[in-house]
Amino acid sequence: MSWFADLAGRAEDLLNRVDQGAATALRKESTSNTFYSKNTDYPELHQQNTDSTYHTGQKANYISSAADNIRHQKATIIAGTANVKVGSRTGGDASHPTEHASVPRPSSHFVRRKKSEPDDELLFDFLNSSQKEPTGRVEIKKEKGKAPVLPSSQSSAVSSVTTSVTTIKATEENSGSQSPEVSSSDSMPEGHKKSTEESTVSNAISVEHSSVPSDGSMSHELSNLRLENQLLRNEVQSLNQEMASLLQRSKETQEELNEARVRVEKWNVDNSKSDRITRELRAQVDDLTEAVAAKDSQLAVLKVRLQEADQVLSSRTEALEALQSEKSRIMQDHNEGSSLQNQALQTLQERHEADATLKREQESYKQMQSEFATRLNKMEVERQNLAEAVTLAERKYSEERKKVDDLQQQVKLHRSSLESAKQELVDYKQKATRILQSKEKLINSLKEGSSFEGLDSSTASSMELEELRHERELQKEEIQKLMGQIHQLRSELQDMEAQQVSEAESAREQLQDLQDQIAKQRASKQELETELDRMKQEFHYVEEDLHRTKNTLQSRIKDREEEIQKLRNQLTNKTLSNSSQSELESRLHQLTETLIQKQTLLESLSTEKNSLVFQLERLEQQLHSAATGPSSGSSINMSGVDSGEGTRLRNVPVLFNDTETNLAGMYGKVRKAASSIDQFSIRLGIFLRRYPIARVFVIIYMALLHLWVMIVLLTYSPEMHHDQPYGK
């Protein structure tokens, strides 16, 4: 209940603030004249208070009603002590406090607690006094008839009494409206309420009568009324607290009851489910017991039938075992004969294959020797050609050197002639200048001479001048011609020098290239010679290995032929005893093991041979690349390798044997077609392996084909026919 106490404390603080505000407002309004209603008749006021309706509102209405009540109470106190005349209000103003007083408070927290005063004995005496309500009413009526207008003190006392009564009734009715269920069962009886109301009314009347004689008695009665009001408030508060606790308990019990009901309902549902499940299980158990009983009867019948069938089966199995033993004995004899024949055939085939492989290896070795001889001859021819080319280049270089020397000599001669021409030109210029100077001197002397000479002298001088001018023009033309020749010789000399420099550089480059080619040819020749030596050694090793394998295979073939002969003798002389059969079986097992071992040896030898063949092919490719590298014109003629039988350089597994292709019918044709396809694919692979250019072309062709297919797939859009279906 901590929140309840906190709420009560907050309400008390709020009431204290409201009291302070009301006191300040009353002090400001003490100068103004306020009038109360003329209805001083207490029974009418009491009836109006008892018959007024109570309205519920928000907390602001409760606070305003409490503030109005406190304001009215303090107004009566101030009017009684200071003898302030208070007028009657208007009808709307008189009814306003009653309406606000009639509004019930939500709880007793708005009732302000006050300290108990010392005159408790007087309060109890006053409460135990025997004054009655009707006499008070009569006296009030008489006094009303005597004096129509009461003094301000009497009206204020009556208004204070009415407000106190209304506040008490409002608090009681509020508590009753908050807990209607509890008040109906646990609240005070109505007689007690009426007695409290009558006592309050009688107290109000006594206060009214006592307020007429003097102010001291009125203050005493007011204090008594305050005490009584405080006691009533305390009682109402205690009752409210009890009612709240009872309400809380009732709510808790109601919640517990609801929870218990929910639990009971859950238990009932669970019990009903469990009952239903048990019924279903019982029904299933009954059905299963009936089915088990039916199946037991069926099992008994089936057991009898099974016993009969077992007897029939046992008899039949005995007969079958006898037949199978005979069949196995016959099949064993047949298998032994066929296995011996197969072994003989296999040994013969292996012998033929070994001979064929030996022949092929010998032929391939011979071909390789011939190819190497041809390659060596070609290399020697190429070396001779290169030597001749080097000698020719040296000759060309010497000739070019000679030409360069001749050109240099010509240049020197041209330079000397040019210098001599320049010297002659300078000398001629000097001579011409001297002649001109002498002529000018003559002309000047002639001019200075007497002008009285005859016409002959003047004509002679004029003729000489014309001749000199003509000579001068001729000299100028010759000088221009010589200058043109000099320029031409200079340009020719520059061209010759540039040509000489370019020819010298080209000759140097050619010499450097030739020297590089000679060095490369020498290095490649050394490498090829080393490779040839190594390959010769490898061929020797291969020949030795082949001879060894041939000898071992021949010895094995002889051993197998001896074993076959022994087995044939044993087959002709075999007996039907168990001991001879066991010996034959052990012998067959030994033969099969030896065959398996020999097959593994043959496979290992074939793998070694294949590896050697691969090494040879790699060396051939290196030789081919070395031969085609320095001289693009040189090539190896391998036309004789692909032609003829036995030209395969490695032991590629054939799909079918050549001995089995001679069979007639569809089976033989299929074998022939498969073997021909196999041979073609092997030759194609060898061709692509030997010629890398063909491989490059095939790769480019496949890439272009795939690219074209992708372009077609991505760019092709099918034709969309927008015709309607059903031929419309």
Swiss-Prot record:
UniProt PTM: Highly phosphorylated during mitosis. Phosphorylation is barely detectable during interphase.
Cytoplasmic side: 2-695
Bilayer-spanning residue ranges: 696-716
Principal location listed in the UniProt entry: Golgi
Low complexity: compositionally biased ranges: 152-167
Bias (Basic and acidic residues): 134-146
Membrane topology: Single-pass type IV membrane protein
Coiled-coil region: 216-628
Superkingdom of the source species: Eukaryota
Chain positions covered by the region annotation Disordered: 88-202
Lumenal topology ranges: 717-728
PTM annotation (Dimethylated arginine): residues: R27, R89
Compositional bias (Polar residues): 173-187
Gene Ontology annotations for the cellular component aspect, listed alphabetically: cis-Golgi network; COPI-coated vesicle membrane; Golgi apparatus; Golgi cis cisterna; Golgi cisterna; Golgi medial cisterna; Golgi membrane; Golgi trans cisterna
Record localization: Golgi apparatus membrane
Key words of the record: Acetylation, Coiled coil, Golgi apparatus, Membrane, Methylation, Phosphoprotein, Transmembrane, Transmembrane helix
Complex formation: Homodimer. Interacts with RAB1A that has been activated by GTP-binding. Interacts with isoform CASP of CUX1.
General function of this protein: Involved in maintaining Golgi structure. Stimulates the formation of Golgi stacks and ribbons. Involved in intra-Golgi retrograde transport.
Protein name, entry field: Golgin subfamily A member 5
GN (gene name): Golga5
